[in-house]
């Protein structure tokens, strides 16, 4: 009788659920107050004019207007502002 010994079990095969991070509204897009602009870990993007920052570093619009991305300062930081 032909038999094959059972294979061993593995301890791998798990992965965490994706967090859906990233830019949600791009430069020039119109936004309403409260719209999420970026979901991020840490401050990859900094809050500029008319942009608020949540406790998980989410950037959101404080007023209606258009999204503007800019690089400022000696450390070339990326700022996101809303132009009304």
Swiss-Prot record:
The gene is rpmA. Belongs to the bacterial ribosomal protein bL27 family. SUPFAM superfamilies: Ribosomal L27 protein-like. It comes from Shewanella loihica (strain ATCC BAA-1088 / PV-4). Residues 1-22 are annotated as: Disordered. One of its GO terms (biological process) is translation. The keyword Phosphoprotein does not apply. This is Large ribosomal subunit protein bL27. It comes from the Bacteria. Keywords: Ribonucleoprotein, Ribosomal protein. One of its GO terms (molecular function) is structural constituent of ribosome. One of its GO terms (cellular component) is cytosolic large ribosomal subunit. The keyword Cell membrane does not apply. Pfam families: Ribosomal_L27. InterPro entries: Ribosomal_bL27, Ribosomal_bL27_CS.
């Amino acid at each position: 009788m032909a038999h094959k010994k059972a294979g061993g079990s593995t301890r791998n095969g798990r992965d965490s659920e994706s967090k859906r991070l990233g830019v949600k509204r791009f430069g020039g897009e119109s936004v309403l107050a409260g719209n999420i602009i970026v979901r991020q870990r840490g401050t990859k993007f900094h809050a500029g004019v008319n942009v608020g920052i949540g406790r998980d570093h989410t950037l959101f619009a404080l007023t209606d207007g258009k999204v503007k991305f800019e690089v400022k300062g000696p450390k070339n930081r990326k700022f996101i502002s809303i132009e009304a």
